[in-house]
C-alpha cells in the first residue's frame, strides 16, 4: 500500500511537470539594456526592444519584432531584426521569421530617437556617421541570457 501511494505521488508530479513545461509564458523573459530599455520576449518570435516602465511593464515597441541580435555602448543600442511572414504550414495566422526580410536599427539612448529600418549598407553608414566603435558587435540574444 505504501508503494502504491508513492507511485501515485510520482505520477502526479511527473504529469504536473509535463503540463508546466507546455504552458505559455515559461520561456518568456526580458533583458535590461542601457537607458531603461529592455529586450522583451513574449513568445518564440515576439522579441522586441521597448522602454521599461516598471519591473513587469514596458511601453510601446521602439524596435519591432523579431529582434535577433543586439549590441550597445553608452550612447546607442543596435539591433538586427527579421520581419515575420505567415507560416504556410499553419492556417491560424501563426507567423515565422522571414530570413529574407532583414533590417537593422539604431536607437539613440539619450534622445530616444530611432533610426531604421535600415539595410546593411545604410546601417554601416549610420554607425560610421555616429562614430560607433567597431568593437560594438551584434550578438545573438540567446547568447546574452
Where are these regions (language model features)?
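Sec-dependent bacterial lipoprotein signal peptides
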Residues: 1-23
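Intrinsically disordered, low-complexity segments
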Residues: 14, 28, 58, 88-91
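N-terminal export/targeting and maturation segments
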Residues: 23-72, 82
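Surface-exposed loop/turn elements that mediate protein-protein interactions on large endomembrane-trafficking
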Residues: 45-63, 94-119
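Short, conserved, GDST-rich strand-edge loop motifs in beta-rich repeat architectures
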Residues: 84-97
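C-terminal partner/receptor-binding element of secreted or periplasmic proteins
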Residues: 109-145
Amino acid at each position: 500500500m505504501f508503494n502504491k501511494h508513492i507511485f501515485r505521488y510520482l505520477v502526479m508530479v511527473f504529469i504536473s511537470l509535463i503540463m508546466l513545461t507546455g504552458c505559455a509564458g515559461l520561456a518568456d523573459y526580458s533583458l535590461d539594456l542601457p537607458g531603461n530599455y529592455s529586450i522583451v520576449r513574449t513568445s518564440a518570435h515576439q522579441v522586441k526592444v521597448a522602454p521599461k516602465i516598471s519591473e513587469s511593464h514596458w511601453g510601446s515597441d521602439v524596435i519591432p519584432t523579431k529582434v535577433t541580435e543586439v549590441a550597445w555602448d553608452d550612447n546607442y543600442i543596435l539591433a538586427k531584426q527579421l520581419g515575420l511572414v505567415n507560416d504556410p504550414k499553419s492556417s491560424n495566422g501563426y507567423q515565422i521569421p522571414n530570413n529574407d526580410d532583414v533590417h537593422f536599427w539604431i536607437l539613440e539612448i539619450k534622445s530616444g530617437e530611432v533610426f531604421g529600418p535600415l539595410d546593411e549598407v545604410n546601417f554601416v553608414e549610420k554607425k560610421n556617421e555616429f562614430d560607433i566603435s567597431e568593437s560594438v558587435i551584434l550578438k545573438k540574444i540567446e547568447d546574452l541570457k
